[in-house]
A protein has these predicted regions:
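A short helix->loop->beta-strand "cap" motif at the edges of active sites that frequently abuts
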Residues: 140-141, 322-326
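C-terminal functional extensions of proteins
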Residues: 2-19, 341-437
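Electropositive, gly/pro-rich neighborhoods at or near active sites that engage anionic ligands
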Residues: 2-99, 148-266, 423
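Charged helix-capping and loop-helix junction motifs
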Residues: 309-316, 342-347
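Glycine/threonine-rich flexible loop motifs
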Residues: 302-312, 374-382
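Active-site gating loop/helix substructures
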Residues: 238, 242-301
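Short glycine/serine/threonine-rich phosphate/pyrophosphate-binding segments
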Residues: 127-133, 155, 304-311
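A short, basic/flexible loop-to-alpha-helix module at the beginning of a structural domain
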Residues: 102-116, 280-286
Length: 437
């Protein structure tokens, strides 16, 4: 038993030598610093163990004072020692400050591994985007979430009209999803006041972001400050700072204004557009897309969460031109008033139409497993599974079980399964590209 414990301790000690921790270099620097300090001190005090070293120094530098050489060596050693000590402490404190779970070594390794992960840009809105972020934050820390700002309903809509701020609801959900202490932050940000004049119906997170926006001067700075306070992995950006509102034209020629009104007509949507038409993309969003290794569209409401971002021409154009791998996560079920009877190809064609390009994505991720009892329950409510029609799709089709195991019978994407499927496809695509070269 004692031997096993000893072996375990030795194994844990050996883990400090694993590649990727970026801490061994500072240990080596501390060791070299200590060595230089020791040698310099021995030369300065003329100790016998360095007799041969002193003889070499005298021959090489006959006109230089030996004590001066000793002091220089000691100074170099002191600088190396304290630099290594400082960097080691900063590395460890960085992990401790993040409130990461697990022991220090595991947290350090996880943080370093995530810091070297792919640069991912996730574009969308609503609950779909926050679900996705919960999964991909376990793959990389290099995340940029681009959030639509067309929401005009509920608490977000009221704050937008009364305070003149960008709708904070979807932004709030994304910040909570990327926070280290996700459960607590989500409960806090989602807390909705049930009483109180002016407060009733508002969520704490929406009010928090609105207050920060008032203090800092704009929503981007408010998001940045709240992200720092909550130690989130990655960053969250609105797609535009313009007061963007959505409008839809239906197949019968009628037009409706406002995101919350679009599904209510229960008509087939011909096109979606923004008011004003030429909204300007945030510069940081464009820079992130250009620098991305992987761009993910969806999941989420096709016409009110995903496509609104592509109506900003700069964003759509940059996604099309981007060298990154690009994948669309298709919804599992149809959405009443938006995508009734839609096939997977209908989703893709709607994206192409509004982005003005059929080069928008390289692949589509679809769910391939749905229990009959779940499908029947949703069918009674007017929702059908989005059926795959591979013959009409001209990009890679990735079929995986994506639904979350639910005792309540709810059809929801599993953040873990979606993130894993996307990452496997991304790595496979990288290997294919290398083989071609």
């Amino acid at each position: 038993m004692k031997k096993n414990l000893l072996d375990k301790e030795l194994l844990n000690d050996a883990k400090w030598l694993m590649p990727g921790l970026q801490i061994k270099r500072w240990f080596i620097l501390i060791f070299l610093g200590s060595l230089f300090i020791t040698i310099g001190g021995m030369i300065f005090f003329n100790l016998r163990p360095v007799y041969f070293t002193m003889e070499i120094i005298r021959k090489v530098a006959t006109h230089v004072n030996t004590d001066l050489i000793a002091l220089i060596i000691m100074l170099i050693g002191i600088i190396c020692f304290f630099k290594g000590w400082q960097k080691t402490n900063l590395t460890i404190l960085d992990v401790k400050d993040s409130k990461a779970k697990g022991n220090l070594l595991e947290s350090l390794y996880r943080r370093r591994k995530l810091n070297r992960g792919p640069k991912i840009v996730a574009i969308g809105g609503g609950t779909g985007l926050s679900m996705l972020l919960r999964g991909i934050k376990n793959i990389t820390n290099n995340i940029t979430a681009v959030v639509t700002v067309g929401d005009d309903g509920g608490s977000s809509g009221r704050l937008r009209e009364e305070m003149g701020v960008l709708p904070p609801g979807d932004i709030r959900n994304c910040i909570a999803a990327l926070a280290d202490n996700e459960d607590l932050i989500t409960k806090l940000f989602q807390y909705r006041f049930k009483t109180g004049e002016g407060l009733e119906g508002h969520s704490f997170g929406n009010l928090f972001l609105t207050a920060l926006c008032s203090i800092t001067g704009d929503m981007v700075r408010a998001i940045k400050e709240s992200s720092n306070v909550l130690s989130i992995r990655g960053r969250v950006l609105p797609s535009t700072l313009d007061n963007m509102k959505l409008a839809a034209e239906y197949e019968d020629g009628t037009i409706v204004h406002g995101e919350s009104n679009i599904p209510e007509a229960h008509k087939k949507i011909k096109r979606l557009f923004t008011e004003p038409e030429n909204c300007k993309a945030l510069e940081d969003v464009i820079a992130a897309i250009k620098d991305a290794d992987l761009i993910i569209l969806g999941p989420g409401s096709l016409y009110t969460s995903v496509i609104p971002n592509l109506l900003i021409k700069e964003i759509a154009d940059e996604v099309v031109k981007a060298k990154a791998k690009k994948i669309y996560v298709c919804n599992i079920m149809s959405q009443p008033g938006e995508t009734d009877n839609y096939l997977v190809s209908d989703h893709i064609n709607a994206l192409y139409k509004h982005a003005n390009s059929d080069q928008l994505i390289d692949a589509v991720l679809v769910n391939d497993f749905l229990p009959q009892n779940m499908a029947q329950k949703y069918e009674e409510a007017g929702q059908l599974p989005v059926r795959l029609d591979s013959e009409n799709i001209h990009v890679d089709v990735v079929e995986k079980k994506l639904i979350e195991d639910s005792k309540e019978g709810l059809v929801r994407h599993s953040s873990y399964r979606v993130a894993r499927a996307i990452y496997y496809w991304y790595r496979k695509s990288q290997r294919k590209d290398k083989d071609k070269k």
